[in-house]
Structures are given as C-alpha cells and as structure tokens.
Curated annotation (Swiss-Prot):
Keywords: Cytoplasm, Disulfide bond, Electron transport, Nucleus, Redox-active center, Transport. This is Glutaredoxin-C5. Pfam families: Glutaredoxin. One of its GO terms (cellular component) is nucleus. A motif (Responsive for interaction with TGA factors) lies at residues 132-135. InterPro entries: GlrX-like_pln_2, Glutaredoxin, Thioredoxin-like_sf. The keyword ATP-binding does not apply. It comes from Oryza sativa subsp. japonica (Rice). Disulfide bonds join C49-C52. PANTHER family: GLUTAREDOXIN. The gene is GRXC5.
Amino acid sequence: MQYGAAAAEQAWYMPAAAMVVAAAAETAAERVERLASESAVVVFSVSSCCMCHAVKRLFCGMGVHPAVHELDLDPRGRDLERALARLVGAGGAAAAAVPVVFIGGKLVGAMDRVMAAHINGSLVPLLKEAGALWL
C-alpha cells in the first residue's frame, strides 16, 4: 500500500470518510456563511417557489449570474432553511425565509429587501462593488 502511505503524507490529502466527518461538524449557520462568501451573488432558493424564481430572473435579466443553492434539493436543506429564517428574522417560518440573497458575502435579505434595493437604485451599486456587474 505504498500509494496510501505516500498520499497520507501529502497535506492536501483527506480521505472521503474524514471529509464526511468534517462536513457533519459544520453547523447550518456556518455552512450558510461559507456558501454566502463563495460567490459575488448567492441566492438560497426553493425550486418550486415563485418568489425565488422571480429574484433569479431579476438577476439574470441584469446580466448577473448568481450561485443558486436549491434548499429542497439539498439533504441538509431543512437545517439551512431554519438558519436562514433566523438570519432574516422570519420568526422560524422557513417558508417565509426564501429567497435569501447575499451580495459580496453580506446579507441583503429576502425578496422584499432585494426588490426595494432594485427600485430605489441601490442594488446596482451593491452588485458593482461585489464584482458581479461591470457596467
């Protein structure tokens, strides 16, 4: 098993079982924070939600391509929904918590906040500052 011994010495090597343990140790709130910081624009969504579809279409119409995390397709999606509901102050109502948008790693909020920012003209500067929009 020379390959196994050599691979174990490498700093980048992590066996699949260790990766699962590391992922399980990450709380839902930590996962939300990590995912929110991985792209300029991140949308936490439910695939059957019309408001989620509307916010995704808004960004695509502006030429912004957000990272979309469909919570209903994620095995840990329920936990993420609860963490997001706490973040946006939905009082534990997970259904009221989506879509949740992060721009530049910062919480913008749910659909009402995104649309308010779009209408009052503050959404485009946020997108430019995050590097999601160049024009």
